[in-house]
Design a protein with these regions (language model features):
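Plant-biased, solvent-exposed loop and capping regions
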Residues: 1-1004
Length: 1004
């Protein structure tokens, strides 16, 4: 081989040297021999080294697609996939493995490829750091590592790549700051570091890069301002730093970037005005400043940028009028986006019409002015004849939609919603044959939908909701065969849904809620096979659901509530496997709910107030993502299925007002996200489950009107977020646990109509957000806790009636200044009515009747009717007899006295007759006895008669109300025999009514 030959030649030369020439001459010639003889060997060594380096780089990669399987020492390295060599010389100059699905890391050994000028490892899944060793590759001109999963910081060693022209390392989760050393890469033309996680400021050393043409730093977390030194990048064509946290003002020096074609500063925190120097960027075609905090007006200097095609200044705080910018001067402008600023005034006539003669001479295709405070009409837009998209929504525009709207024949999108347009939808709208989106919602449009709308064969979205439109939905609308979404919510459309609705084969959303539509749901609706959302609620639709409903295989949301639909559900609905939301509440549906349970993806099933019967099928639990299950007000019966415990995402469970029986299933304890549990109005038995206390998200618990027994479990105190607790109308007993006081968020506590005993726990004072407290019709005893006066939000009612409460009314109740109704009737309260109750200025219903109260009624409380105080024998003062007046005897006492008078009178007559017959025979003795009896009796009768007369007179003159005693007795008797609490209102006179008017008693 070559090495052996070389060795032989050297030996031969040395042998000859001993005989012919001196050794010094031989040694001097030896390198020349080596260079000649060993050249092939040196080249082979270089190739071998490059091959070994590449194989070492390969070892760091994972190659699932086997792209690098051909890399082997036996093959020529220049034939390896992705390797580029200098033609004819075998020197590796490029490595391109972009998009090969590689993972793994970049080996530092890659720096051994000293002759490589281009490395492209982009669009793979490489991880790890960028090797700092890359900075030693002096020949490198192109480094593309973008779109990988590289992490760590950008190595500052890259600043040593003096020949580097193209650096793209974006779309990696790189962290840290941009190394200022990159400013030493004097040949750099492109820097791409977008979509990383870089922080810190843009280094001012970037301004040293005189050859830089593109700088892309979008979507990082860079801070600080734009460095003034960027003005040194005289060749910069693209500057994009969008979606960072850059702030400060836009430097006026940016106007010195004379080569700039694209400027994107969007979604930062720049403030101040738009520098007029931007008008010096004569080559600018793209200007995007959206999403900053810019103020001031739109500089007129922008009109000098004749090459501009896109201007987006939206989502700032720009003010003034838009007349500063003229599409007629910016003849290449296609996009003008000024949405969501503070612009005012009107749409200028000269926007697209420079000569003012109504002849448009601009190229403007897309105009977005939404979310400002523009007024006036949109007539000026009619000269922008190139327009394809108009969005002037969310302004204060007025007037009518101009009939000449068809002067914009290329219009594709027309968005006029959220303004104050009036008048009718002009029939000329049907001439816009390219129209795809018509959004007119939330205006004041009247009249009907013109039949000409049926010409819009390309129309996809038709939004007319929240207007005042009337008339029938025209059949011609169903000729718009491209329609995908129709929303007429909140108008006054009447008549039937068009029978030809099935022509809309592409319809995905049909929203007709809150109109006056009548008649049945058309059977042809089943032909709308693309329908995903159907909302027909709040109309006057009637009839049964058509069997064709079962063909709507894509249907996900269907709301039919508040109509007059009836009958059993079609069995075909069981085939609707994509249903997620069903709301059929407030109709007249009957039969079983099984047809609605074909889908296992239900999140809402609301069937409240219908006439569904049977049991809840266990199949309902297949929809494990169910959030709301509302079956209240039906005729469902049987036990609550234990399978409901599988609905672990459930937040609302309302089974109230049905015929369910049995215990509350313990499996419901698995529904840990429940916020509302309503089981009231059934026939449930057993105890209130202690596990309810584990439902930490519970906000409403209503188990009222059942047949539950036992006590209130102390565990309920664990429901710290509970807002409403209602256990009324059961057979519960025992004491009210003090743990109820832990429910500090409670607004409503209703425990009435049970058999609770013991005292009212003073711990209730901790429920300081209570605005309704009902404990009536129990057997509670002891005093009313003064602590109840510490419930400052109590407003709707405090009802403690029909218990066995004793003691005095605590003065602290006067602190309940928001209270509107107070019922303490039918207890054993004694003492005086505390004057502090006069502080209850919001009180309009009061019932203190049937207690043992005494003393005078405090001043302003006299405005309440006498029934509010009845049954308290020692109370006096208006509206009762005044204090100190003779007491009016009850009817029983009057009857007894009358009977006594009659008996005594008869006895006197008999005695007198007896005396006369005796002819004075025993006069002295009889006279003595008769005289004493007679005087006593006569004086008693006279006293009784005077007392009743005086009492009657004073009683019926109290106030200005005169009520017969029998009526009064009947009223009180009625009040005391009622089975529900009765509160008595103030007379109308106190509220401004006529004298003597009395409000009827009200039930709570």
């Amino acid at each position: 081989n070559t090495a052996s030959v070389a060795q032989l030649m050297v030996s031969l030369v040395l042998a000859m040297a001993g005989k012919l020439i001196s050794s010094s001459i031989v040694l001097a010639l030896l390198p020349l021999f080596c260079g000649i003889l060993l050249a092939p060997s040196c080249e082979a060594a270089t190739v071998d080294t490059t091959s070994a380096t590449l194989l070492q780089v390969k070892s760091g990669f994972t190659d699932p697609n086997g792209v690098l399987s051909g890399w082997s020492p036996e093959a020529d390295v220049c034939s390896w996939h992705g390797v580029t060599c200098l033609t004819g010389e075998g020197i590796v100059t490029g490595l391109n493995l972009s998009g090969y699905g590689l993972s793994g890391t970049i080996s530092p050994a890659i720096a051994g490829l000293v002759s490589v000028e281009s490395i492209d490892l982009s669009s793979n899944s490489l991880t790890g750091a960028i090797p700092p060793e890359l900075g030693t590759m002096k020949s490198l001109k192109t480094l593309l590592l973008h779109s990988n999963l590289l992490t760590g910081a950008i190595p500052p060693e890259l600043g040593g790549l003096k020949n580097l022209k193209l650096l793209r390392i974006g779309n990696n989760p790189l962290r840290g700051e941009i190394p200022p050393e990159l400013g030493d890469c004097s040949e750099l033309e492109t820097i791409g570091m977008a979509y990383c996680q870089l922080i810190g400021a843009i280094p001012h050393q970037i301004g040293n890069l005189k050859q830089l043409q593109q700088l892309a730093l979008d979507n990082n977390t860079l801070t600080g301002g734009l460095p003034e030194q960027l003005a040194g990048c005289a060749n910069l064509r693209v500057l994009s730093v969008a979606d960072n946290k850059l702030d400060g003002v836009i430097p006026s020096s940016i106007g010195g970037l004379s080569s700039l074609q694209s400027l994107n500063l969007a979604n930062n925190q720049f403030s101040g005005v738009i520098p007029p120097e931007i008008g010096n960027l004569s080559g600018l075609t793209y200007l995007n400043l959206l999403g900053n905090r810019l103020t001031g007006g739109i500089p007129e200097e922008l009109n000098r940028l004749s090459q501009l095609q896109v201007v987006d200044l939206s989502k700032n705080n720009l003010s003034g009028e838009i007349s500063a910018i003229s599409a007629s001067q910016l003849k290449n402008l296609k996009y003008l986006v000024l949405s969501e600023n503070l612009l005012e005034g009107t749409i200028p006539e000269g926007l697209c019409n420079g000569d003012g003669n109504g002849n448009g001479n601009s190229s403007l295709e897309n105009l977005f002015l939404a979310g400002n405070d523009l007024g006036g009409s949109i007539d000026a837009l009619l000269s922008c004849t190139s327009l394809k998209s108009i969005d002037v929504s969310n302004n204060s525009l007025t007037g009518e939609i101009p009939p000449a709207i068809d002067r914009l024949p290329g219009l594709v999108n027309l968005a006029l919603h959220n303004n104050s347009f009036a008048g009718v939808l002009p029939p000329q709208i049907g001439n816009l044959s390219n129209l795809e989106v018509l959004s007119l919602y939330h205006n004041g449009l009247t009249g009907g939908i013109p039949p000409e709308i049926g010409r819009l064969q390309r129309l996809k979205l038709l939004f007319l909701y929240e207007n005042e439109m009337t008339g029938a939905i025209p059949d011609e609308m169903t000729n718009c065969s491209s329609l995908e979404e129709v929303d007429f919510f909140g108008n006054h459309f009447h008549g039937p849904i068009p029978a030809s609705i099935g022509n809309l084969k592409n319809l995905a959303v049909l929203q007709l809620r809150q109109n006056d539509l009548t008649g049945p749901i058309p059977a042809s609706l089943g032909e709308c096979r693309s329908l995903q959302a159907l909302a027909l609620a709040d109309n006057r639709l009637s009839g049964e659901l058509p069997e064709s409903f079962g063909r709507l295989a894509e249907l996900s949301v269907v709301t039919l509530y508040n109509n007059s639909l009836e009958g059993a559900l079609p069995e075909s609905m069981f085939e609707l496997k994509n249903l997620t939301v069903i709301n059929f509440s407030h109709n007249r549906f009957t039969g079983a709910v099984v047809p609605l349970l074909g889908s296992s993806s239900l999140t809402v099933l609301a069937l409240t107030n219908n006439s569904f019967s049977g049991v809840i099928p266990a199949a309902v639990a297949r929809s494990t993502g169910m959030v709301r299950l509302q079956l209240a007000g039906n005729r469902l019966a049987g036990a609550i299925p234990a399978e409901l415990g599988d609905l672990t995402e459930l937040k609302i469970l309302d089974l109230s007002n049905n015929n369910f029986s049995g215990d509350i299933p313990p499996e419901l304890s698995n529904c840990s996200r429940l916020t509302h549990l309503n089981l009231d109005g059934n026939s449930l038995t057993g105890a209130v489950p202690p596990w309810l206390g584990g439902l930490r998200s519970l906000g409403e618990l209503d188990l009222s009107s059942n047949a539950l027994t036992g006590g209130i479990p102390v565990e309920l105190g664990g429901c710290s977020g509970l807002l409403k607790l209602s256990l009324s109308g059961n057979r519960l007993s025992g004491s009210i646990p003090p743990e109820i006081g832990k429910l500090t968020s409670l607004n409503v506590l209703n425990l009435q109509k049970n058999g609770f005993t013991g005292v009212i726990p003073p711990e209730l004072r901790r429920c300081n957000k209570l605005y309704e407290l009902r404990l009536s019709e129990n057997s509670l005893e002891g005093p009313i806790p003064a602590e109840l006066g510490q419930l400052p939000e109590l407003q709707v009612i405090l009802d403690l009636s029909r218990n066995k409460l004793s003691g005095e009314i605590p003065a602290s109740l006067g602190d309940l200044v928001k209270l509107e109704r107070l019922n303490l009737s039918s207890n054993q309260l004694h003492g005086q009515i505390p004057p502090s109750l006069l502080q209850l200025t919001s009180l309009h219903l009061l019932n203190l009747s049937d207690n043992l109260l005494s003393g005078g009624i405090p001043g302003a409380l006299s405005a309440f009717p006498a029934a509010s105080f009845a049954g308290n024998g020692e109370l006096c003062g208006a509206p009762l007899p005044s204090c100190g007046a003779p007491r009016r005897l009850p009817g029983a006492e009057v009857s007894a006295i009358v009977a006594a008078i009659a008996v005594v009178s008869a006895a006197v007559c008999v005695a007198l007759l007896y005396i006369m017959l005796r002819m004075w025979s025993n006069w002295r003795a009889v006279a003595s006895v008769s005289s004493s009896d007679g005087e006593e009796t006569a004086s008693s009768v006279a006293a009784a008669h005077g007392k009743w007369c005086a009492g009657d007179g004073k009683y019926w003159k109290v106030g200005s109300v005169s009520v017969a005693s029998s009526a009064a007795e009947e009223k009180y008797s009625s009040a005391s025999s009622e089975t529900t609490s009765v509160l008595h209102g103030k007379p109308a006179e106190a509220a401004g009514g006529g004298a003597g008017a009395v409000k009827p008693a009200s039930k709570c």
